[in-house]
């Protein structure tokens, strides 16, 4: 039986065509240029719409570097992505679900993350929930800015 999960859910509406948003946000190798928190993203395996990769964060002030392997399954037709950590580190488990929904003002990108921290982890479920929730908002705002700039650049070229 799996422990009760902590959960965060955040969304942002991005004024860009779905195809552009999908392509940019699912180009894992380019995540260090999309997200501010990643120092490196290494593709380990890719089979069709499934990618296994290693993410490495920028070093913490004390020099500690966090890195882990995740697997991501992209379903463009249904506009969803499911991911989980393969190397769980301080997490007992981490499951992530991304959805993309067309709205009148753009595409709503939603991230739902369910997880549970291991005993002895640097943060408990409540602390990690607060950290993930705060950081998701920062990263989504950055992605919105970068994807909307790319959409404007593409629209400018198309004229």
Name what the model sees in each region.
Residues 1-50, 110, 159:
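Hydrophobic ligand-binding cavity/cleft-lining segments
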Residues 3, 32-33, 43-49, 58-108, ...:
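Hydrophobic-ligand binding "helix-grip"
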Residues 16, 126-127:
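Short, contiguous strand/loop micro-motifs
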Residues 19-22, 137, 141:
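Amphipathic alpha-helical segments that line or abut small-molecule/effector binding pockets
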Residues 120-126:
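Short acidic, glycine/proline-rich loop/turn micro-motifs
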Residues 127-135:
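Individual transmembrane alpha-helices with interfacial aromatic-anchor signatures
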């Amino acid at each position: 039986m799996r422990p009760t999960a902590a959960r965060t859910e955040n969304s942002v509406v991005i004024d860009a065509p779905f195809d552009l948003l999908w392509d940019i946000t699912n180009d894992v190798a380019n995540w260090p240029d999309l997200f501010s928190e990643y120092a490196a993203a290494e593709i380990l395996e890719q089979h069709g719409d499934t990618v296994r990769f290693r993410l490495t964060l920028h070093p913490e002030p004390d020099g500690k570097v966090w890195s882990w392997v995740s697997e991501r399954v992209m379903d463009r037709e249904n506009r969803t992505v499911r991911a989980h950590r393969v190397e769980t580190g301080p997490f007992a488990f981490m499951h992530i679900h991304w959805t993309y929904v067309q709205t009148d003002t753009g595409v709503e990108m939603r991230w739902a993350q369910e997880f549970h921290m291991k005993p002895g982890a640097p943060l408990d479920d409540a602390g990690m929930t607060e950290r993930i929730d705060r950081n998701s908002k920062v990263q989504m705002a950055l992605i919105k800015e970068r994807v909307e700039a790319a959409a404007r650049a593409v629209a400018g070229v198309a004229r």
